[in-house]
């Protein structure tokens, strides 16, 4: 967890980065450092740090040969060793970011760099470099009062509480590529991120969050895509497995792959199929997954949002299933020529 209760924003720079495909260019003023009064510092501290307060998903800068060749790593390294270079290095970052802004969805906007001191990350004192690319601006109403009347003005400004594209780089794990966290709400989940993949060029740290997240995805993919065809499971069976998979991650502090396999799949054929799929999955994605680790509840909460325990019947009915596979029966009515579900229950609301 990130504690910024005593944090100080000692340097703050601003430039403007446009969309390269639209030839909008980059604006780097001769003086990128912005002097801040106390209230502005307080607003920026909250805007740039609060979104990362409870994050457990961390990354390192990545380079195929050596991380010391990574351009952003080099720039951050320079700033951490000499914060006085913030202004010059911020201009270099803006130029690098512009080269990555070719997606038509990327809007031109301010690019901020903040240098934060007196932070605590998991109880360890750290300094950090914050990067914030403004994607959208909002309209604000401002009233002015006089003895006779009020006047109303519409101002264009940056929403301080909505980070859509940002990163926070900490001055720890320098040899590995600096520990950092990142936000990108612009790119879709299944598409390449201009921010994470092209500009930051990062790789996830292989920790408890990483293992929990990927085992949930692995199990979900097996249950919803592989098992129905290989093991002949219907929609009710797959929902039951998804629910029991969720219960395992929510109810246990430690994950053990064999315990999970035998708890979730009662038949040996199912267990063998899951073990085989796990091997295929880890090889296909080059994932060095652990067999035993502490479960990250933040990863559980985030990942299980994507699994839908819903049986959709034509366009008329939806059945939400949260457990008790034994209370649902599926069949076929010969007389009506239609499939049916029978649900047993004790009370209704």
Where are these regions (language model features)?
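Long, hydrophobic alpha/beta structural blocks
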Residues: 1-303
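C-terminal, beta-strand-rich globular interaction domains
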Residues: 275-349
């Amino acid at each position: 967890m990130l504690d910024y209760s005593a944090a100080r924003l000692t340097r703050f720079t601003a430039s403007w980065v446009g969309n390269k495909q639209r030839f909008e260019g980059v604006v780097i003023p001769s003086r990128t450092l912005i002097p801040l009064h106390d209230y502005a510092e307080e607003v920026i501290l909250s805007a740039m740090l609060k979104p990362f307060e409870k994050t457990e998903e961390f990354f390192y800068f990545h380079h195929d040969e050596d991380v010391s060749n990574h351009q952003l790593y080099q720039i951050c390294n320079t700033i951490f060793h000499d914060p006085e270079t913030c202004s010059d290095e911020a201009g270099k970052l803006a130029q690098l970011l512009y080269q990555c802004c070719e997606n038509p969805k990327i809007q031109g906007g301010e690019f901020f760099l903040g240098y934060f001191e007196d932070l605590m990350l998991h109880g360890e004192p750290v300094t950090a470099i914050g990067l914030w690319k403004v994607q959208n601006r909002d309209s604000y109403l401002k009233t002015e009062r006089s003895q006779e009347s009020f006047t109303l003005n519409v101002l264009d400004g940056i929403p301080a509480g909505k980070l859509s594209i940002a990163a926070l780089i900490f001055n720890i794990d320098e040899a590995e590529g600096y520990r950092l966290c990142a936000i990108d709400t612009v790119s879709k989940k299944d598409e390449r991120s201009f921010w994470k993949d092209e500009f930051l060029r990062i790789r996830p740290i292989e920790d408890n969050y990483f293992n929990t997240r990927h085992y949930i995805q692995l199990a979900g993919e097996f249950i919803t895509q592989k098992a129905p065809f290989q093991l002949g499971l219907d929609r009710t069976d797959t929902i039951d497995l998804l629910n029991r998979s969720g219960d395992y991650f929510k109810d246990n502090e430690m994950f053990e792959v064999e315990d999970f396999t035998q708890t979730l799949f009662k038949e040996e054929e199912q267990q063998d199929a899951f073990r085989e799929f796990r091997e295929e999955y880890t090889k296909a994605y080059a994932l060095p997954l652990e067999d035993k680790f502490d479960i990250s509840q933040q990863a559980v909460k985030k990942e299980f949002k994507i699994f839908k325990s819903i049986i959709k019947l034509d366009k008329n009915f939806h059945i939400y299933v949260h457990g008790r596979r034994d209370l649902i029966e599926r069949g076929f009515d010969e007389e009506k020529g239609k499939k049916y579900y029978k649900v047993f229950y004790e009370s209704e609301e």
